[in-house]
Regions:
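A short helix->beta-strand "capping" segment at the edge of beta-propeller domains
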Residues: 3-18, 60-67, 117-122, 272-276
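WD40/WD-repeat beta-propeller blade N-cap
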Residues: 15-22, 69-77, 118, 125-132, ...
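Loop/turn segments within WD40 beta-propeller blades
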Residues: 26-31, 80-86, 136-142, 181-187, ...
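Surface-exposed loop/turn positions within WD40 beta-propeller blades
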Residues: 31, 40-42, 95-97, 150-152, ...
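Conserved strand-to-loop turn within each blade of WD40 beta-propeller repeats
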Residues: 37-40, 91-95, 146-150, 191-195, ...
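WD40-repeat beta-propellers
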Residues: 43-48, 98-103, 135, 153-158, ...
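Short loop/turn segments immediately following beta-strands, especially the blade-tip
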Residues: 47-57, 102-114, 157-162, 202-207, ...
């Protein structure tokens, strides 16, 4: 159900600086940093903090530009994703590559020349045959996923020395893959596509990475995905002007509802995701992004935006 009186949102800041379209934003999980990326090929990092507003006793959030990273990508930077530690930033680009950036510790920077950047590129991942649309770190930092216009999803294993190795290439979609998102507590990956579907993948002990479920309910391109913080729900936003909320069901719940999972993996047999609620009638244009608020909300609709 939808709240009777939706909360009013107040604009905190208007961040300007990119010369062209801004495509994606990502909050650093450990530091007070916000990353943005753009068609201008740059990545901008903003710090933020709360300041007392004086006599009223309230506070305001102030943003400040910390660094502009010339990404080195040859085309649009489409997506940014932080590692769980907040020390590595991944970028995906229409030039078909993924860039990897790491923070230079203060003790090392002190020995470098003035003006040296706080972040430097330490690697580039290649493999996609066309535009790389999205990139996402797993909750524990063990894996990085990327997807592209070539209909593929790549999974990269992250080794302790920050060396990235391809762990799987999955071509389950029939069209352009728009986004990839990891489950917040398990190594489950979701992807969404121009083919109107959502795919779920797991590292099966017998078959490596496999697609174990296909979610179908949207009537057009699925642009965005977001797992709830508790991991029980998945929200999907689409070109069909609606948002679906999917509920994760175990094998017993699937049997009770008469749901038969489309695919099976040896360690997820019988599990399924059920389309439990559809938000529609509130949008007049395609929905390009959806995200959950922090916290384990008992009612999924109350924490979604």
């Amino acid at each position: 159900r939808m709240p009777a009186q939706p909360q009013t949102l107040r604009k905190l800041a208007d961040l300007q600086g990119h010369a062209e379209t801004v495509w994606n934003l990502a909050w650093n999980p450990k530091k007070s940093l916000l990353a943005s990326c753009s068609t201008d090929k740059d990545v901008r990092l903003y710090s933020y903090k709360k300041l007392s507003s004086g006599i009223s006793g309230g506070s305001e959030t102030v943003f400040r530009l910390e660094e502009v990273i010339p990404s080195g990508h040859k085309r649009t930077v489409r997506c940014v994703s932080w590692s769980p530690t907040g020390d590595i930033l991944a970028t995906s680009s229409f030039d078909s590559t993924v860039g990897l950036w790491e923070h230079i510790p203060d003790d090392i920077r002190s020995s470098m020349s003035d003006g040296s950047p706080d972040w430097e590129c330490f690697g580039t991942l290649e493999g996609h045959e066309s535009e790389c649309k999205s990139v996402s770190f797993s909750y524990n930092g063990n894996f990085l996923a990327s997807c592209g216009r070539d209909k593929s999803v790549w999974i990269w294993e992250v080794h302790p020395d920050a060396d990235f190795e391809c762990a799987g290439v999955l071509i389950e979609h029939t069209q352009d893959v728009k986004t990839v998102k990891w489950h917040p507590k398990e190594e489950i990956l979701a992807s969404a596509s121009y083919d109107n579907t959502i795919k779920l993948y797991i590292d099966d002990p017998y078959y490596d990475w496999v697609c174990y479920d296909t979610l179908e309910a949207h009537d057009s391109t699925v642009w965005s995905l977001s797992f709830s913080p508790c991991g029980r729900y998945l929200a999907s936003a689409s070109d069909d002007l609606s948002i679906w909320i999917w509920c994760r069901l175990n094998a017993d719940d699937c049997k009770k509802r008469g749901i038969k999972p489309r695919e099976k993996a040896s360690n997820r047999e019988g599990e399924g995701w059920y389309p439990s609620y559809r938000i529609k009638g509130h949008f007049t244009r395609p929905i390009y992004s959806v995200s959950w608020a922090a916290g384990d909300a008992s009612d999924p609709a109350q924490a979604l935006g």
